[in-house]
């Protein structure tokens, strides 16, 4: 897995949602807010690791680094759920990202 892109992550999230469709609420715009809140909770867990141990230690020490990466993966899973909730495709996200990048590159 040399390159891990948005389409692959979206496909994995769709598979996860399908597996638990009888236990979880369906993916739809109304669920987007809940997924945003869950994602913020996961971001808080990332912040706790860095705040408690410092960025250098969190990025260098193996067990702590693994925990940091796991929490960042949780953030990405919720992020991809949010994209699914609002029907945002990888192509739309890519174009918006490029547009924002170009805007930021020309700011100063």
Predicted regions and their residues:
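Flexible "arm" and connector segments at domain edges
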Residues: 1-108
């Amino acid at each position: 897995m040399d390159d891990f892109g948005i389409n692959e992550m979206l496909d994995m999230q769709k598979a996860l949602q399908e597996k638990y469709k009888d236990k979880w609420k369906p993916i739809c715009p109304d669920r987007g807010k809940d997924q945003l809140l869950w994602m913020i909770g996961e971001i808080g867990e990332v912040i706790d690791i860095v705040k408690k141990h410092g960025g250098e230690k969190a990025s260098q020490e193996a067990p702590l680094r693994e925990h940091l990466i796991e929490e960042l993966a949780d953030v990405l899973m919720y992020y991809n759920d949010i994209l699914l909730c609002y029907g945002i495709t990888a192509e739309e996200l890519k174009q918006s990202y490029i547009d924002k990048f170009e805007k930021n590159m020309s700011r100063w």
